[in-house]
């Protein structure tokens, strides 16, 4: 009974209302017409890469800053993010963010205050994330993996403020890329020791102790 219910709930519906581009891409399909559509989708993906590369190619040295979209502008962490981005901007770095509200807005605001190029890589979401008002170069993406390529390819470092699943995704993908030598080692800074302390304890006391990662792997992270 449980398995039957799961099959019903998990059955993909490619044409259902509100399906995102990522959902449509990842759904398993069986009819040949839909499979043909998947083959043609590669051109849309390629187009996103081309647009991203063209827009980002002349921004110069940059730092990608991540953090929660839900952070309020009246919190100390928001103001610290503004200040961090401002100082990086004054040092000659463009600032790259996900282009949305919260910490992304704070970083783009700081970039503007520091006289730096402020880049927002926005993503299509079901709840329609809108770009913030502090962006010089705005690029819209349908696919997360294309967007994340821009964060890594054009950044000299990552600064990661407290955030949720999206922030964790960006953190652990960058750690994986560095660990597997898919990209050169670059500074990966976690801002806010109190917030990140529990995660770092778990990495050290569980993952290292059980041999899932090495103690040297933790040297990739600065707090």
Walk through the language-model features, giving the residues of each.
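Solvent-exposed alpha-helices and their adjacent loops that cap or buttress functional pockets
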Residues: 56-58, 87-89, 111-112, 129-133, ...
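Structural motif
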Residues: 61-64, 93-94, 116-120, 136-138, ...
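C-terminal functional extensions of proteins
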Residues: 191-223
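Short gly/pro/ser/thr-enriched loop/turn and capping motifs at secondary-structure boundaries
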Residues: 125-130, 167, 195-198
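Short, solvent-exposed amphipathic alpha-helical segments in soluble enzyme
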Residues: 112, 173-178, 204-208
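Active-site/ligand-binding-proximal alpha/beta "capping" segment
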Residues: 142-194
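Acidic/glycine-enriched connector segments
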Residues: 79, 102-161
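Glycine-rich beta-alpha loop segments
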Residues: 2-22, 27-121
């Amino acid at each position: 009974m449980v398995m039957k219910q799961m099959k019903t709930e998990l059955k993909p519906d490619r044409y259902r209302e509100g399906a995102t581009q990522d959902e449509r891409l990842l759904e398993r399909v069986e009819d040949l017409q839909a499979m043909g559509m998947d083959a043609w989708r590669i051109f849309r993906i390629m187009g996103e890469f081309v647009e991203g590369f063209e827009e980002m190619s002349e921004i110069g040295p940059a730092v990608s800053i991540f953090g929660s979209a839900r952070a309020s502008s009246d919190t100390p962490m928001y103001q610290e993010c503004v200040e961090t981005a401002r100082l990086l901007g004054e040092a000659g770095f463009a600032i790259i963010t996900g282009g949305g509200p919260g910490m992304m807005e704070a970083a783009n605001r700081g970039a503007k205050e520091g006289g730096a190029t402020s880049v927002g890589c926005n993503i299509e979401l079901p709840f329609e994330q809108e770009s913030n008002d502090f962006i010089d170069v705005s690029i819209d993406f349908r696919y997360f993996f294309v967007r994340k390529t821009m964060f890594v390819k054009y950044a000299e470092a990552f600064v990661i403020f407290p955030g949720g699943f999206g922030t964790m995704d960006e953190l652990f993908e960058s750690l994986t890329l560095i660990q597997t030598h898919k990209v050169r080692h670059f500074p990966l800074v976690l801002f806010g020791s109190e917030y990140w302390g529990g995660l770092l304890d778990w990495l050290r006391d569980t993952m290292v102790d059980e041999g899932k990662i090495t103690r040297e792997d933790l040297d990739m992270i600065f707090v």
